[in-house]
């Protein structure tokens, strides 16, 4: 099979993934607004379409990654993405917004950047738990609640 990396097809897959992902979010926002406005049927159609877009995005994601990466790889990727967002992206966006006189937008970029830092830290802690085999181990007595039925163990 030909090498996908660096090809126009890879660029197209990235664009398709981004487009479908953005459409999914947009349609969920539209669904919320339609529901708030009293249009249940329209809200339902937006949500249905959002789920379709999610599945389309998943097709492109899997092709880009030769399948679905394992959880450790996903945590590493998520942490790296969050790190970029809080160290480079939002910091740079805030600086530009301030320079252009958009102080409120700059504040929002900075505030979201702080949240992204917390996201990175959370992913790194979860990754460490897997690496140290402590996902299901805690000191002292612990109660576990079933995420499906709610039973407490």
Locations of regions flagged by a protein language model:
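Non-heme di-metal
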Residues: 1-153
